[in-house]
């Protein structure tokens, strides 16, 4: 056990060292010095990571140990690239402190994760508050529409703000809706698994079971219509369909979900101008008409592609590229910043780290026996995998841009805090999945066996007494001679409660 813990803390310290080296290299090349405020905050962040690891070892000792080091490297790399753009902005007279703010958000996320580890010993507690989670999730999702606090940024009304500070409540809404989806599908899995008629070789669900998926589909479209947020609406719908498949095991739900998705996507591209503009930029990225558009064109996308090409195989090196040429290179397009300064090799490492987190969550979902935990783990990990796929796919022209950001890397405190909580929830569920089953001791087995034997003996005596109650006096005398307890009965006799007397346990029955 000690060797295992040394290996785990060694992995965490190595990931922290990699993050610090990346920071130091970037500052040395881009600024020529390492600012003291960044150094102090980095030390605090490292201490919080170690403290979180200690809490996990105490309260969740069997949890997955590959998730936390992966988050350390991803978040460190993201903050390094964000700070790189801050340094360039300072040189041109437009100073920003997005990287420093992101470090503060990371510290806050680690504190909240530590509290979650201490307070939430058993994830099954979340099932008791399924409908409360639904209400909280919907309130968070619709809160940007409230007058006075709602903010529209980049054409999407998904922010709430107080003064100069903004928050994206939809990032937290996905967690609460995942709790509700998991509890609802676990309670209704039998009804949803019942099949109807076959179509194209698949047994389709009954018509009356279409209600949940239609409701979630309509809510997703409402998010798209009201908030102009394509990525969030797709994420909620995809999360529900994936959890529905896990709950029922029927591929027909995947087919039905895909049909609903295609219908919604085509209708949205024809009705909503901002969705149609993204589709046009995806289909014709290099056309002069699309590239020259002031808003909604392909200029950002094309610059990101050239940034990836400039990185080559090994990249220009941290602090030596020009990622600021691509708009939003510190948030939506931070993946292109990685490709430019670390090259294809760096991109593959980043994808491998995400794969480690996703694989850990999938293994947890397969291993855990509790149905609610299986659904919750699969829903959370699919949400993260879907985000990574849509961001990478949008930048590389596989799919249109959706507006989602890379977890742990992109600028944005709401996303960072929510995804850190998501990762800790996966660790808590994995602790339950990996915890060894308690062994039955010999004393416990002896107690249960003797209790069963005593119950059988008592029932036999009762039956014999009933059968002999109507016999003559000779039979009664004979029964009286043989009904008394024998020496063997006295040795194995148990009290009425079925417990073994203490003297027998200690003295071997003497």
Question: Across the structure, where does each feature detected by a protein language model lie?
Answer:
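Hydrophobic alpha-helical transmembrane segments
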Residues: 43-51, 104-112, 341-361
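Hydrophobic alpha-helical segments of polytopic membrane proteins
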Residues: 210-270, 282-283
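Long, low-complexity, intrinsically disordered segments
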Residues: 467-510
